[in-house]
Amino acid sequence: MELIQNAFEQGLIPGIVIVIYLIINKIIDNNKRNPLDDIAKLLNIVTRDIIEKDREKSKSVVFIAINNAASECTKFVASTIITNNVDSNRDQIEYNARHLVNSVYYDTYSKLNMYRGDEDYLSHYMKEEWKEDIYGDIINIVYNKNLDSNQRILAFNKRIDIRVNDYTAYIINKAFK
């Protein structure tokens, strides 16, 4: 009996010390923030920032790509009006205009296909009918007999600027809701 009492006394004090240590350790751990939570918060902030920058970059790409296409069309119209006898070269001008419009449309399409909106690639918001609209503008303005050369060039510049703004706004609004 004395042996059991002696063992109990010797084991009780270390047991109490261990229990107190575990309680204090648990209290300290609860007061500490979990480092994984801090890492998760940091990743959320960084990811959100990257996504927002990517959205802004994509919006800029839409504007630049469509503006470049419009610039090519404007150069074509200006050089055609200035250097060609438009009446005698009508077939060639129409052929060149058709191919230019197709070329700049698909070039813009391929550039926009490298970037995504919220749900889909930016190029998927382009419309095939835009090619016909631009082609029609080129032909109608180049062959407008009521305007002189400078007026036709200015008229096309104004028309293409309106289209650039419309197409850019359309793609951005559809891609980034």
For each feature predicted by the language model, list its residue ranges.
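N-terminal signal-anchor transmembrane alpha helix of single-pass membrane proteins
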Residues: L3-K32
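Short juxtamembrane segments adjacent to a transmembrane helix
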Residues: I28-S60, I64
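Repeat-associated, polar segments at repeat-unit boundaries in modular proteins
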Residues: C73, N96-Y105, Y109
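Amphipathic alpha-helical binding modules
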Residues: D133-Y135, I139-F176
